[in-house]
Amino acid sequence: MNRRDFMKANAVIAAASAAGLALPAGASNLITSSEQTKLEWNKAPCRFCGTGCSVMVATREGKVVATHGDANSEVNRGLSCIKGYFLSKIMYGRDRLTSPMLRMTDGKYDKHGEFTPVSWEKAFDTMAERWKATIKEKGPTAVGMFGSGQWTVWEGYAAVKLMKAGFGTNNIDPNARHCMASAVAGFMRTFGIDEPMGCYDDMEAADAFVLWGSNMAEMHPILWTRVTDRRLSAPHVKVAVLSTFEHRSFDLADLPMVFHPQTDLAILNFIANYIIQNNKVNWDFVNKHVNFRKGTTDIGYGLRPAHPTQMKSKNAATANDSTPIDFEQFKKFVADYDVESVSKLSGVPEHKLLELAELYADPKVKVTSFWTMGFNQHTRGVWCNNLMYNIHLLVGKISTPGNSPFSLTGQPSACGTAREVGTFSHRLPADMVVTDPKHRKIAENIWKIPSGIIPEKPGYHAVEQSRRLKDGDLNCYWVQVNNNMQAGPNINEEGLPGYRNPANFIVVSDAYPTVTTQAADLILPTAMWVEKEGAYGNAERRTQFWHQMVKAPGESKSDLWQLMEFSKRFTTDEVWSKAVLDANPKYKGKTLFEVLFKNGQVDKFPLADADPKYMNDENDAFGFYVQKGLFEEYATFGRGHGHDLADFDTYHKEHGLRWPVVDGKETKWRFREGSDPYVKAGTGFEFYGKPDGRAVIFALPYEPAAEAPDEEFDMWLSTGRVLEHWHSGSMTQRVPELYKAFPDAVCFMHPDDAKKRGLRRGDEVKVMSRRGEIKTRIETRGRNKPPVGLVFVPWFDASQLINKVTLDATDPISKQTDFKKCAVKVIKA
């Protein structure tokens, strides 16, 4: 042993001794070879939220063994949140699924049978048999898919192709419908193009930050560190936080405001009125770049048509309509929202409302507004987004460093996959929609499929899918990368009945047993994160790639492999109409795999193009560079149309690029001359998503929530996440450190509400609504401090399914669920 190895050995022995550990006599031999302890490090975006942190991933002997923040990342600059620290453990839970499982009795499929391990061949045989029979009997509208903002870009793209171009149905929707659909509709209505115009660089330039329904301290902690650094480094910077309850982000707030649920609409209109009444309108900007419209009102709440609340609405069928108005009409509309009436309605003191409005009105103050689920999970979520843009447009505080209305994404690729790829039931890639015949034609040409394959009618959105499953209209259903039986609303009445409907066949692809897999008929084991090559797109339009670093356990396969392999089971004769095939005989007898994935475009990149240093299971399975082919075909949709992506190989070299990427250069601020290559010289600003290049300011009122407390159900319920857990906890609750940090959900309640009900901290209670109930324990201290009359229950805990209690009301425009407001009562269990 040389001196260096001797010193290393003694260091290990000393450390072990200090920790009270005994090493075997020959332990020094274990470390004499550096090859045996060598770690391979590679970059990957974090698996969790929409921030898009980059992490360095260490592998050894075929396993991920460590992660740390990537110091070269512009997003997180070497930092990780508590979930990011434990990324190395999310794939190694003891109950990881490793083989397909089919409900069987006596060797045959039985909806009421026990889950039994089967081969992939048997799984796909059974699945295809059900799909074919359903399509033959009822047509393609009876099959559907529920996907995810956690799909990789090419997984989502392959799913869209399979459903819309293969099966000829638009019945595909992502779980991003629950989190970002209102943001999408807000962007499209105001700007005609989706996703934020600003970027994270705004955080180093802003003079004020305003959080609307966003607990960044827990939900976007790395971004919150940048906000905190700016606030503490620059004494003039102010932070305002608005929410229906107090949370950790309030710790930094100079201007904290707790408002009554749903009254954010009135507060937003008050700010617009204040700007106008105090002569703070940026007339040069408004005259050149803005139009005014009045939106349709009394639009309902997205409930079933026969629901008494829904039946009262007058304009549900025309919810997205609007009519032109002028500035004077808009001024008159918002004039009713004066500080006295809005303070009374919202519960926010007048002086705080005035101070908030002045932040926006003062031309010397650069303002960045952040919002997430408090705005989007709202029966008027689209309106909230539109009203937020109204304020920034009135004062011209937009598309410049520090001036940004910024919708923060929740999932790692809700932007990059759900939105940009177009995995929604009404969308196609690059902001195109199925209802536009020109858009359908473009997609059919790029996909090299016959005209008429893509239906013009949008498919069933997320909540509608559950209803249609229950009603027997949707009979074959494939769920990937989500846990909707825990995450969806009103699961007792509208979720579980559809999954267990005897007429339906439910397939769930997942890495772990979940509430949703328990309700399935067939479970497919899925590869996770760096067990496959992937790409995500984050909240600032940054696309990031990673290589496959380890093998998935057992027979687990990526969602991409599952989609492509399943497509081999169908020929065009089984899924396309006779009329289409007679008019296009060259497609007859071909498999959907041949039409969609071996079409001369997706399969044109050879295996030699892949980096030989990295494994790639999909390449091995299909014989070509699958991810590159899918990405380059997909990128065709956006190039030259304001959604430009760089070439595939560039992303593996970079730490992500913000689109549009033109001539190799990313775009930080969209719509501004000199920053955005799509803005014409001499215009200053151009909102080119609209034909006339002008953004829209909407006149939209305050309207009440779908369900409010009454004498029997006397409290508001709000649900949400906590720092330690990701969504339904199916990954994070299997990490011991994260589980121990927050093992069980609790009901956060104001001490006065507890006292009124004869309750004390730690008491077991029932949280009950008209739809269902759960048992939990009362928490009157800690991070979340609801006002009197409201309780907060996080939804990560599968043993406390709070979505038994929630209402399946949605925004009538975006179809996004309101998880923040329903009426409950809390009683001692």
Curated annotation (Swiss-Prot):
Family per record: Belongs to the prokaryotic molybdopterin-containing oxidoreductase family. NasA/NapA/NarB subfamily.
Record organism: Shewanella denitrificans (strain OS217 / ATCC BAA-1090 / DSM 15013)
Disulfide bonds listed in the record: none
Cofactor: [4Fe-4S] cluster; Mo-bis(molybdopterin guanine dinucleotide)
Enzyme class: oxidoreductase
GO biological process: cellular respiration; Mo-molybdopterin cofactor biosynthetic process; nitrate assimilation
Pfam families referenced in this protein's UniProt entry, alphabetically: Molybdop_Fe4S4, Molybdopterin, Molydop_binding
Primary localisation category: periplasm
HAMAP family documented for this protein: Nitrate_reduct_NapA (MF_01630)
Protein name: Periplasmic nitrate reductase
One annotated GO molecular function: iron ion binding
Record-listed [4Fe-4S] cluster binding positions: C46, C49, C53, C81
Iron among keywords: yes
GO cellular component: membrane; nitrate reductase complex; periplasmic space
